[in-house]
């Protein structure tokens, strides 16, 4: 299993993971129950339940480089462009800024 801490405005907003069943995102309890917290994406509204998907959630997939930059990333890091979680983990320290 691979797992990433998702930050929003320097606070742990949740956890993104990948296992043999696909991708999972869950909001951190402290973040979820803070009155000032907002969803990290319109497609991932605040909720207690885990989001599950067979593919990387589009919001996170959109953070991965594309085009010529993806080619450079693949060449330098020797990653397969189909390894979306690997690309995401290496391409960015996930810190979302409002």
Model-found features: residue ranges?
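Broad phosphate/nucleotide-binding scaffolds in NTP-utilizing and phosphate-metabolizing enzymes
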Residues: 1-98
